[in-house]
């Protein structure tokens, strides 16, 4: 994986608390190109879903998520393996891929702790939603299975604006 590097601490106040979203930018670009989705929206989804934490694990119960962590890779692997065995509904990794997809495609959830694999799946899921709903923001709203489609879309939109502000401050966006 090509890495663009971590940005200087002098701009830490504007950065999301976890900088993995930037370190994995090359994976986001590759996935966005492969599935014809917008790089910026994919990065905003990552910021909303995990703040860029590749080891994020969220257990879903009664329509609400229970975020576990922060976790080391070893801890995340153990937790994901246990959740998989018990048949729990959970989300894994940087873009919080849901266990429903893992069961459907018969993929060991530990693979989704790799940020680039996880991001590829995020782009795949988003592309499926865009194809199904024929409208980007409706697709974004349905990305995480939320019943509050408009609320989730707005959350992603606000993250998109936040990331655009960071890019502008760095001279990456004019």
Label every model-predicted segment.
Residues 1-4:
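Sec-dependent N-terminal signal peptides
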Residues 7-8:
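N-terminal signal peptide c-region/cleavage motif recognized by signal peptidases
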Residues 14-174:
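Catalytic glycan-binding domains that act on GlcNAc-containing polysaccharides
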